[in-house]
Amino acid sequence: MSKPVKIGPWGGNGGSERDVQPKPIRMVSMTVSSGAIVDAIAFTYVGTDNVQHSSGIKWGGTGGTEDTINLDATNYVTEISGTVGKFGTDDIVTSLKIITSKGVTRTYGSGTGIPFRVPVLDGGKIAGFFGRAGAFLDAIGFYITP
């Protein structure tokens, strides 16, 4: 089994560091809370121990509307893009766009700020997240598996 690779993070330095143990090899579901910005994210995943785990409480605040994407071995995240920018005086994740292998596309937040994009090639998958969070999702990075 290949070890997941960390890519990123994108965003600001506010909030507290967020990460998971064991490291993820496949995402099972993800929940994003958003309005004008990305308020919070949470996910469940299969770890390097082949057991299902949760990221725990949402990383971020309590605002926004919640949306969940359920994934499986044939429907996985192949690309995430988004923007990071100012919200008040804080640098945070202002938008996310999620694309799955089955063509499911979801967009969260306003889309204002500096863009980033993480496409995964050759059958790779976005298996999980790490980053920083406080009252909002301050920064986000990704675990990629082949």
UniProtKB/Swiss-Prot annotation:
InterPro entries: Jacalin-like_lectin_dom (IPR001229), Jacalin-like_lectin_dom_plant (IPR033734), Jacalin-like_lectin_dom_sf (IPR036404). Gene3D superfamilies: Jacalin-like lectin domain (2.100.10.30). Residues 1-21 are annotated as: Disordered. Keywords: Apoplast, Lectin, Mannose-binding, Secreted. Pfam families: Jacalin (PF01419). CDD domains: Jacalin. This is Horcolin. It comes from Hordeum vulgare.
